From Swiss-Prot:
This is N-acetylmuramic acid 6-phosphate etherase. It is an enzyme of class 4 (lyase). GO terms for molecular function: carbohydrate derivative binding; carbon-oxygen lyase activity; ether hydrolase activity. The keyword Transmembrane does not apply. One of its GO terms (biological process) is 1,6-anhydro-N-acetyl-beta-muramic acid catabolic process. Belongs to the GCKR-like family. MurNAc-6-P etherase subfamily. The active site is at residues 83, 114. Its EC number is 4.2.1.126. Homodimer.
Length: 298
């Protein structure tokens, strides 16, 4: 696909005079364009749901979720991956973000990194990619060689693959087994795909990782019951989670958390089933960590 023919490289008539308007009008133009992004994502919800189901199946079987991207796309993958351990208590490495150019590229532009097909393959080899893993290639344009080569290598290994881009029929979309293509149209600043395209990608990644964690029993109701208390704010959140899940008071919630080494799931089962920490943990283990199964089946 030629660059000049890509939707993400097109000229946006709504912002053609943006350099001549007031600051407030400038903000309104950008905001009006941003409003279209959730609608574009809404149109591809079935594709996102299909990807979540595949990711969950692979991760449940011992695989990992691997994000692969360059520039903004790579940074968004790293951002999403880095939030999973503290939010959901998963081990670092279950969700991995890879960026063309390596760690330095998180904060700096690395010239030519996105054009390296070899880089995409080598980065996946370096993390020991296996057929159990799912590789999600992220590229607003859908033409990034680093991502395309990585997806090709992943498919050769037998991995399930997902391609996220904002141009229909792109190489990323056709290379991956599953395509998620929110078409957000031309950017306010021509070609600046960190804007609407980046926002769309962030929304999609939010759904992929959150959907995976919900289906993995990391959420009870709408509570993040595997949150790790790494600071005072999260200590308070743990207490509130146990309170909201059980109806107990703050003192009871704190006592239960202390008794089970601050594991929200265990504390919730302790309170709701009137169990000690050891028995509550045992029942959770018997039901794969799903609070709802412990409550519904016993």
């Amino acid at each position: 696909m030629q660059l000049e023919k890509m939707i993400t490289e097109g000229s946006n008539a709504a912002s053609a005079e943006i350099d001549r308007v007031s600051t407030l009008e400038m903000c309104r133009i950008i905001n009006d364009e941003d409003k279209t992004v959730p609608l574009a994502v809404e149109r591809v919800l079935p594709d996102i749901a299909a990807a979540i189901d595949v990711i969950h199946a692979q991760v449940s079987g011992g695989g990992r979720l691997i994000y692969l991207g360059a520039g903004t796309s790579g940074r968004l993958g790293i951002l999403d991956a880095s939030e999973c351990p503290p939010t959901y208590g998963v081990k670092p490495g279950l969700v991995v973000g890879l960026i063309a150019g390596g760690e330095y590229a998180i904060q700096h532009a690395v010239e030519g990194a996105e054009d390296s097909r070899e880089g995409g393959v080598n980065d996946l080899k370096n993390i020991g990619l296996t057929a159990q893993d799912v590789v999600v290639g992220i590229a607003a344009s859908g033409r990034t060689p680093y991502v395309i080569a990585g997806l090709e290598y992943a498919r050769q290994l037998g991995c399930r693959t997902v391609g996220i881009s904002c141009n229909p029929g792109s190489a990323v979309s056709t290379t991956a087994e599953f395509a998620i293509t929110p078409v957000v149209g031309a950017e306010v600043v021509t070609g600046s795909s960190r804007m609407k395209a980046g926002t769309a990608q962030k929304l999609v990644l939010n759904m992929l990782s959150t959907g995976l964690m919900i289906k993995s029993g990391k959420v009870f109701g709408n509570l993040m019951v595997d949150v790790v208390a790494t600071n005072e704010k999260l200590h308070v959140r743990q207490v509130n989670i146990v309170k909201n899940a059980t109806g107990c008071n703050a003192e009871q919630a704190e006592a239960a958390l202390i008794a089970c080494e601050r594991n929200c799931k265990t504390a919730i089962v302790m309170v709701l089933k009137n169990l000690d920490a050891a028995e509550a943990k045992k029942r959770l283990d018997q039901h794969g960590g799903f609070i709802r199964q412990v409550l519904d089946k016993e």
